[in-house]
UniProtKB/Swiss-Prot annotation:
Similarity-based family: Belongs to the protein kinase superfamily. Ser/Thr protein kinase family.
CDD domains named in the record: STKc_NAK_like
List of residues binding ATP: L28, T29, S30, G31, G32, F33, A34, Q35, V36, K56
Note: Present with 1551 molecules/cell in log phase SD medium.
GO CC list: actin cortical patch; cytoplasm; mating projection tip
UniProt name for this protein: Actin-regulating kinase 1
GO molecular function: ATP binding; protein kinase activity; protein serine kinase activity; protein serine/threonine kinase activity
Protein origin, superkingdom: Eukaryota
């Protein structure tokens, strides 16, 4: 947008601005669309009791710009009675005669005859500002900002800088230029709002004074009073060192938040610490305007000039979601800091978490009270006589009380022995009952003394008689004689041979000790299972009271049976071998069908199929020969 080309008023030009008669005294400066004059007004300003005022003439090209200027005038009207803000006197707007569609606006305001703060600082280049001067300027400018933040809803200046502070005739520093004033800007919710906020920030703020949340709008932080606090920190740094802390780095330096203090001029650590506390990346950790003024007042050794304006107020329509969260957090902090204790108004739980009856906790504590069950995380409030988990009077869990812990430990120690005794008894009963049913179902009346003799005090004779039986058992087990159901008959034959052939002429009465072979019910069919049922008096009786059997006969009988078995197995092997030889001679032996030899398989190379001949019409035709090569002569004369 091009700046309208307008001329300046001559000295003595008279105008009417609202209810005041104005006469131009002097042309002061111009910038942008505005021109500034000093003028005489009638009637005088009641606030400053002066007849000299400042006239600001602005050419507004369109209605949106007119609305922006109207917002500036409205902000000045709200801050009219503050001594550290340039006061508003009167205003007027009319259609401009110079440009089509543009407006001409006149604003009368307080005249600060000592000029701007930037001019005063330029006069002190060699003799820099002292710390008490810096604190005085900072205190007065901050009070002007506090007047804006105290409004409901609060206003944000957004363009606090050295150039926007004027000095009155009474040596008071006043905040001016409210053209960038706005309310709280909530975080943008879509790309359109994001683009609008970014363009608005670029238009209405100064680069070196922008806060991190203004530069990085993707942080999702609101632009509120804390952005003005950041600008005040930059303002204070420039008062001290005549430059901004992020002058060289730009936006990246602001986002990093790292800065240094020059060696000259040298200021107190309190002042440097105040700058550090203001220039914090997170706006929630920056002080508000009251806290900032209080710190400055302590350094000046004067009382704080304002009351705490950051009080908890009822939510209103202008508060956004972030402010409501901050409001609730502030209320919680105030309630926690109050001396009165709040009662627990939480209702009882309507749900119940149950535990299995066979858990370790339930087994170890079978006789616990309902209040003790809560310690095992059952959380049942519906049981009769149960106590809540949290005691309002003592503010501690019942499970941590000493009277509950001691009986708990004793009950654990008392029940350990009972559990061990009960488990041993149950295990013994289960073994006895299982053995009883096993004997009834799968019992073979077989005298165990004939295979495994019982232990006696005189171990010499029993060991000799036992050696042959052990060898027999090892051999028969290795051959799998007790692994299938079909070998029961073999076991019976062994029984008969032991009772008849090895014991001739004797009457044998079997005892109650039996070998029980479990064939069908065993989970592992090839396992030899035996159980021993001992009667009351069998353990103390001798094994061979009425038996007169020679040891040599018993050994001979066992050896003879083993030789017979070996001979029979050799004969069967020879018979099978002869049958195979005969079949081979006749040519009826089975031939392998899969592989003819055990050597490696040789892979034959596949022959590629011959492609069919190409049709003649698809064969490429040679290009026609030139006429010279075809035997014809070219006649050039035609």
């Amino acid at each position: 947008m091009n700046q309208p080309q307008i001329g300046t008023y001559n000295v003595g030009t008279q105008l009417t601005v609202g209810s005041h008669q104005v006469e131009i005294i002097k042309y002061l400066t111009s910038g942008g669309f505005a021109q500034v004059y000093s003028a005489l007004i009638n009637p005088p300003d009641p606030h400053s009791n002066s007849s000299v005022a400042c006239l600001k003439r602005v050419i507004v090209p369109d209605k949106p710009s007119l609305n922006t200027l109207r917002a500036e005038v409205d902000a000045m009207r709200l801050l009219k009675n503050n001594r550290y803000v340039v006061s508003y006197i009167d205003s007027h707007a009319a259609k401009a005669m110079l440009h089509n569609g543009s407006y001409e606006v006149f604003v009368l305001m307080e005249y600060c005859e000592r000029g701007g703060l930037i001019d005063f600082m330029n006069t002190r280049l060699q003799n820099r500002l002292h710390e008490f001067e810096i604190l005085q300027i900072m205190s007065q400018v901050t009070q002007g900002v506090a007047a804006m933040h105290a409004l409901q809803p609060p206003l944000i200046h957004r363009d606090i800088k050295i150039e926007n502070v004027l000095i009155s005739a009474n040596n008071e520093y006043k905040l001016c230029d409210f053209g960038s004033v706005c309310g709280i800007i909530r975080p943008p919710r879509n790309s359109q709002e994001l683009s609008y906020v970014q363009q608005d920030i670029l238009k209405n703020t100064t680069a070196q004074y922008r806060s991190p949340e203004m530069i990085d709008t993707f942080r999702g932080l609101p632009i509120d009073e804390k952005s003005d606090i950041w600008a005040l920190g930059i303002f204070l740094y420039k008062l001290c060192y005549y430059t901004t802390p992020f002058e060289k780095g730009g936006d990246l330096a602001i986002l990093s938040g790292k800065f240094e203090f020059p060696l000259y001029p040298n200021y107190s650590e309190q002042l440097k610490g105040l700058i550090r506390d203001i220039l914090v990346q997170d706006p929630r950790h920056r002080p508000n305007v009251y806290q900032l003024l209080k710190r400055i007042s302590i350094m000046q050794n004067v009382p704080c000039p304002i009351n705490d304006i950051q009080v908890v107020q009822a939510p209103s329509s202008h508060l956004n979601l972030t402010e409501l969260h901050q409001l609730s957090a502030t209320q919680n902090i105030l309630s926690l800091n109050s001396p009165t204790t709040m009662e627990n108004t939480m209702p009882n739980a309507t749900f119940q978490i149950s535990m299995a009856d066979n858990t370790t906790t339930a087994q170890m504590h079978p006789n616990r009270k309902p209040s003790q069950i809560a310690y095992d995380a059952s959380f049942s409030n519906s049981a009769k006589g149960s106590q809540p988990l949290f005691d309002k009077s003592q503010n501690m869990y019942h499970a941590l009380d000493p009277p509950l812990v001691e009986p708990l430990a004793s009950s654990v120690s008392n029940n350990d022995n009972e559990l061990k005794a009960n488990s041993a008894t149950k295990l013994k009963q289960a073994i006895v009952s299982e053995a009883h049913t096993f004997r009834q179902n799968n019992s073979i009346d077989f005298p165990l003394q004939n295979i495994i003799p019982q232990y006696e005090d005189s171990s010499s004779s029993s060991d000799e008689s036992y050696s042959g039986d052990v060898d027999e058992l090892k051999k028969t087990r290795s051959l799998g004689s007790y692994s299938t159901r079909g070998n029961i008959k073999k076991n019976q034959s062994v029984k008969e041979s032991l009772t008849s052939s090895s014991l001739p002429g004797t009457s044998f009465t079997p005892t109650s000790t039996k070998v029980n072979l479990k064939h069908e019910n065993s989970p592992f069919k090839s396992t030899f299972v035996n159980t021993i049922d001992n009667s009351k008096d069998d353990l103390n009786k001798p094994s061979y009271e009425d038996l007169d059997v020679s040891k040599q006969n018993l050994k001979n009988s066992i050896q003879q049976r083993m030789i017979d078995k070996l001979n029979s197995s050799e004969e069967s092997f020879n018979a099978r071998k002869m049958s195979k030889v005969k079949l081979h001679e006749k040519g009826e032996i089975d031939k392998p069908t899969m592989l003819k030899s055990s050597g490696p398989i040789s892979k034959d190379k596949k022959t590629k199929p011959t492609p069919p001949p190409k049709p003649s019409h698809l064969k490429p035709k040679p290009p026609p020969k030139p006429l010279l090569l075809a035997g014809r002569k070219l006649s050039l004369d035609k």
